[in-house]
Amino acid sequence: MPLRPFIPLHPVERAEQPKRAASRCSTCALRTVCMPPDLSPDDFARVDAMICTTRHVRRGETLFRPGDTFNSIYAVRTGSFKTIVMHRDGDEQITGFQIVGESLGLGGVYTGHHNGEAIALEDSTVCIIPFGQLEQMCREVRPMQHHVYQMMGGEIVRESSQMLLLGTMTAEQRVAAFLLNLSSRFKARGYSAAEFVLRMTRDEIGEYLGMKLETVSRMLSKFQRKGLVAAQGKQIQIVDSEGLRQI
């Protein structure tokens, strides 16, 4: 029985086709983070043809807003972002912080429109991945298909972890879990797991963790007194990671 022709759910129109930029996935230092490790040279050539442009987003600028048409997902190449959803009463809720090598915009797959907002925490760069082309490649390249499944599964795990964090943990446990989570993500990208800079404000951390700025500051001060962390401004040093895990 012949296969029916594949029609992508999110086709990329000709006018949306980006012009080629100098950056290439095949030579990017982050390719082991963003891409499957077992792509062939021919597959990487296809990826280079697909992800052929980047976008610079200055600190405080928005990458996408609620209601924007979903055409692409984004991979953070440099910098960092926060994602926000708006409640019906107009209040905002920070739902995550994305660092180098992580994706943005996957939620738009569901309705064809972005349901939240992504704002740069610092001057940042993203790689633009047209989702219609990615769908086609996933159908033909099994490692890429599996990688996209992993990305979507990771989003589900992240959201369920946040629900657990907000629903069952004490304020002390929330801040400890937040620092350990950042530490492991930086380590996975080849950065120091023990020393890093918090690009978000303590007020933003509190909004994400469901607590006030003063509570975040009080918990960090408590960790310093216990010798678990050293903090100077936004610079964080994890002195005793095992101690943080035991909180």
Locations of regions flagged by a protein language model:
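Short phosphate-coordinating micro-motif centered on Lys-Gly-acidic
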Residues: 62-68
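Glycine- and acidic-residue-biased ligand/ion/polar-headgroup-sensing regions
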Residues: 60, 71-84, 99-101
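Local beta-strand/beta-hairpin segments that build beta-sheet-rich folds
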Residues: 63, 95-96
